[in-house]
Curated annotation (Swiss-Prot):
Lineage, broadest ranks: Eukaryota, Rhodophyta, Florideophyceae, Rhodymeniophycidae, Gracilariales
Gene that specifies this protein: psbL
Keywords: Chloroplast, Membrane, Photosynthesis, Photosystem II, Plastid, Reaction center, Thylakoid, Transmembrane, Transmembrane helix
Function: One of the components of the core complex of photosystem II (PSII). PSII is a light-driven water:plastoquinone oxidoreductase that uses light energy to abstract electrons from H(2)O, generating O(2) and a proton gradient subsequently used for ATP formation. It consists of a core antenna complex that captures photons, and an electron transfer chain that converts photonic excitation into a charge separation. This subunit is found at the monomer-monomer interface and is required for correct PSII assembly and/or dimerization.
InterPro entries: PSII_PsbL, PSII_PsbL_sf
Assembly, per entry: PSII is composed of 1 copy each of membrane proteins PsbA, PsbB, PsbC, PsbD, PsbE, PsbF, PsbH, PsbI, PsbJ, PsbK, PsbL, PsbM, PsbT, PsbX, PsbY, PsbZ, Psb30/Ycf12, at least 3 peripheral proteins of the oxygen-evolving complex and a large number of cofactors. It forms dimeric complexes.
Protein name: Photosystem II reaction center protein L
Length: 38
């Protein structure tokens, strides 16, 4: 699963995964709220 750039810092990878995790949680929260309040 290592990209073409193995010298990439793990901090950037952690920030990217954290950003995608928060985005996924936000989208799920919006979907669930619209489903429950409808």
């Amino acid at each position: 699963m290592s990209g073409p750039n193995p010298n990439k810092e793990p901090v950037e990878l952690n920030r990217t995964s954290l950003f995608w995790g928060l985005l996924l949680i936000f989208v799920l929260a919006v979907l669930f709220s619209s489903y429950f309040f409808n």
